[in-house]
């Protein structure tokens, strides 16, 4: 079949599209020139004119001829005449006189003939005669006394000597030994300082006293026990053991002595004058020494001049 012009034009357009859409990239090696190969030329296409098909005439639309409707008048059915209601003819009632039954004659009551009663006189029975029975008089028979039996004679049972009880030694009581509970030791420690003006330093050789009062009963004076501590060391530290006092509920710690002539006036800082109640004061327990240690103070002495107020610790 010969190639037409239209098909050739389409082939050229497709080739141009493929050329434009092709991916170009730079070759890694320089191109090698090859001599073009001459392909045999195709013969020129022979143009064949298109064959035109005959154009059909447009269809002619004609309205269908519809015959006009023929009017047929409706056929009216014959309406029946309304029914005529006639009353039924009831013949008049014919009166038939009642037939009377013959009347019965009333019954005739006749009294029955009762014979008259025949009187028979009653037969009287004689009244019985009651006679009292004769009861013989009782015959007294004296009682027969049975002989009283003699009291039984009891024989003494033979005495049997029981064997002596076996010897049972008395148990020896050994008192149970209570486990040893070490006594809890109690002690008081603290520091005594001197505050002279703005200078504060520990006092060597100062002492404190512990006053324990026993509350007396009514009308009796209470007794007091006073214990003095050893003199303080160079750091003003004191330590006093309370082994002789069992109850610390009524014990107070107070200042007692200062050997420094320029610092002998006790102050009430931390209750150095009124006394520290040990019952209301906490303690530290040392289990290795079995010791309850009450740490009080620090207490202060001052010189003749009034010292500035010292805060409580």
UniProtKB/Swiss-Prot annotation:
Q: Where is the signal peptide?
A: 1-22
| UniProt keyword list | Cell wall, Repeat, Secreted, Signal
For this record, the Gene Ontology CC terms, alphabetical, are: extracellular region; plasmodesma
Provide the tissue specificity: Exclusively expressed in roots, particularly in root hairs-containing regions, and especially in root hairs.
sequence repeat ranges? 30-34, 35-39, 40-43, 44-48, 49-53, 54-57, 58-62, 64-67, 68-72, 73-77, 82-86, 87-91, 92-96, 97-101, 102-105, 106-110, 111-115, 116-120, 121-125, 126-131, 132-136, 137-141, 142-146, 147-150, 151-155, 157-163, 164-168, 169-174, 175-181, 182-186, 187-229, 258-262, 266-270, 298-302, 308-312
Domain of life where this protein originates: Eukaryota
* Pfam families hit by this protein: Pollen_Ole_e_1
Q: 35 X 5 AA approximate repeats: where is this region? A: 27-312
Tell me the Gene Ontology biological-process terms attached to this UniProt entry.
cellular response to auxin stimulus; cellular response to calcium ion starvation; cellular response to ethylene stimulus; trichoblast differentiation
| Induction, per UniProt | By 1-aminocyclo-propane-1-carboxylic acid (ACC) and a-naphthaleneacetic acid (alpha-NAA), ethylene and auxin precursors. Repressed by the ethylene inhibitor 1-a-(2-aminoethoxyvinyl)glycine (AVG). Lower levels in calcium-depleted conditions.
Query: Can you say where in the cell this protein is located?
Result: Secreted, Cell wall
PANTHER family membership: OS01G0164075 PROTEIN, PROLINE-RICH PROTEIN 1-RELATED
Q: What biological function has been recorded for the protein in this entry?
A: May contribute to cell wall structure in root hairs.
Q: Which family does it belong to?
A: Belongs to the plant proline-rich protein superfamily. ENOD12 family.
Q: What is this protein called?
A: Proline-rich protein 3
Source gene?
Answer: PRP3
């Amino acid at each position: 079949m010969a190639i037409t012009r239209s098909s050739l034009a389409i082939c050229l357009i497709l080739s141009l599209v493929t050329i434009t859409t092709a991916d170009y990239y730079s070759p890694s090696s320089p191109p090698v020139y090859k001599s073009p190969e001459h392909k045999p030329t195709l013969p020129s296409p022979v143009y064949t004119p298109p064959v035109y098909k005959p154009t059909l005439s447009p269809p002619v639309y004609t309205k269908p001829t519809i015959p006009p409707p023929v009017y047929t008048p409706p056929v009216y059915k014959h309406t029946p005449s309304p029914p005529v209601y006639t009353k039924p003819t009831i013949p008049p009632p014919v009166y038939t006189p009642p037939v009377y039954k013959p009347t019965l004659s009333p019954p005739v009551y006749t009294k029955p003939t009762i014979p008259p009663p025949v009187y028979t006189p009653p037969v009287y029975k004689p009244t019985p005669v009651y006679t009292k029975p004769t009861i013989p008089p009782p015959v007294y028979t004296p009682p027969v006394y049975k002989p009283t039996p003699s009291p039984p004679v009891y024989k003494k049972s033979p005495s049997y000597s029981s064997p002596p009880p076996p010897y049972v030694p008395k148990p020896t009581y050994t008192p149970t030994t209570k486990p040893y509970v070490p006594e809890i030791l109690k002690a008081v420690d603290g520091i005594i300082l001197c505050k002279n003006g703005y200078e504060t330093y520990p006092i060597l050789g100062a002492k404190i006293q512990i006053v324990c009062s026993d509350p007396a009963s009514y009308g009796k004076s209470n007794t007091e026990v006073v214990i003095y501590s050893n003199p303080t060391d160079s750091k003003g530290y004191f330590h006093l053991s309370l082994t002789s006092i069992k109850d610390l509920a009524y014990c107070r710690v107070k200042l007692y002595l200062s050997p420094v002539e320029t610092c002998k006036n006790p102050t009430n800082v931390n209750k150095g004058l009124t006394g520290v109640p040990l019952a209301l004061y906490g303690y530290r327990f040392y289990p290795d020494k079995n010791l309850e240690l009450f740490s009080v103070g620090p207490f202060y002495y001052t010189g003749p001049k009034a010292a500035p107020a010292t805060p409580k610790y």
